[in-house]
A protein has these predicted regions:
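PAS-family sensory modules
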Residues: 1-56, 138-139, 143-162
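Conserved long hydrophobic alpha-helices within structured protein cores
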Residues: 37-50, 76-79, 119-126
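Eukaryotic basic, amphipathic alpha-helical target segments in cytosolic regions
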Residues: 46, 72, 76, 91, ...
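PAS-family sensory domains
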Residues: 54-55, 95, 103-108, 115-125, ...
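Conserved hydrophobic beta-strand signature of PAS-family and PAS-like sensory domains
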Residues: 59-62
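N-terminal capping loop/helix in small sensory signaling domains highlighted by a polar->aromatic N-x2-3-F motif
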Residues: 65-68
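PAS-family sensory domain signature
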Residues: 71-75, 80-85, 90-92, 98-100
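Conserved, structured regulatory domains from eukaryotic proteins
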Residues: 98-108, 134, 146-158
Length: 162
C-alpha cells in the first residue's frame, strides 16, 4: 500500500487531472472499441473496469474507467502503467492472487472475489471478472488485452448479483 495523504487535490489540479484522463481515454479507446465494442456499454453503465495490455512487461493498465477511479480513490495518473497489484494488501488472499496470475499467464478468463484496498487504506470485497480480448490476424488468434470488471460486494459469499 502507498503512504500518502488522504486530502483531495485542489480543484485546479483535479480539473487538470480529469482533462488528462479524458485525453488519454480519447487516445486509447478507439482501437479497443474496434475489437471489443461492449466497452461502450460498460462505460454507459458507469461500470468499474480496467483494460490491460499483456503484450507489455508486467501487463500494465492502459485504461481505467471513471467507475474504477471512483471505487478505488486513485487518480488516473496513479493507475496507468501499473499492474493491479497495487490494490492488494495484507488481507488479500495469496491463493486467490495466484489463481488470477495463473489465468492471466495462460491467457484465460477468471472470476474471483478478493479483498482489495482503496487509496485511503479502506478495504472492500471485490468480485473481479477478467476476460481476454482476442483478434484474429493472418489466421492466428492474438491476445490483445484483458478487461477486468470490478464489482464491490458485501462479503466473499455475495456473488454481486443482489
Amino acid at each position: 500500500m502507498e503512504e500518502e495523504g488522504h486530502d483531495n487535490p485542489p480543484p485546479d489540479i483535479q480539473h487538470a487531472a480529469n482533462a488528462a484522463a479524458h485525453q488519454h481515454w480519447d487516445n486509447v479507446l478507439p482501437p479497443i472499441l474496434e475489437v471489443h465494442p461492449a466497452v461502450t456499454a460498460f462505460l454507459e453503465a458507469n461500470a468499474s473496469f480496467i483494460i490491460t495490455d499483456p503484450r507489455l512487461p508486467g501487463n500494465p493498465i492502459i485504461f481505467a474507467s471513471p467507475g474504477f477511479l471512483l471505487l478505488t480513490g486513485y487518480p488516473i495518473d496513479r493507475v496507468l502503467g501499473r499492474n493491479c497489484r497495487f490494490l492488494q494488501g495484507p488481507g488479500t488472499d495469496p491463493a486467490v492472487v495466484a489463481q488470477i496470475r495463473e489465468a492471466v499467464d495462460n491467457g484465460g478468463d477468471i472470476a474471483v472475489t478478493l479483498l482489495n484496498y482503496r487509496r485511503d487504506g479502506s478495504t472492500f470485497w471485490n468480485h473481479v471478472l477478467i476476460s481476454g480480448v482476442r483478434k484474429e490476424f493472418d489466421g492466428r488468434t492474438t491476445l490483445l488485452y484483458f478487461i477486468g470488471l470490478q464489482q464491490p460486494i458485501r462479503s466473499p459469499s455475495d456473488d454481486g448479483s443482489t
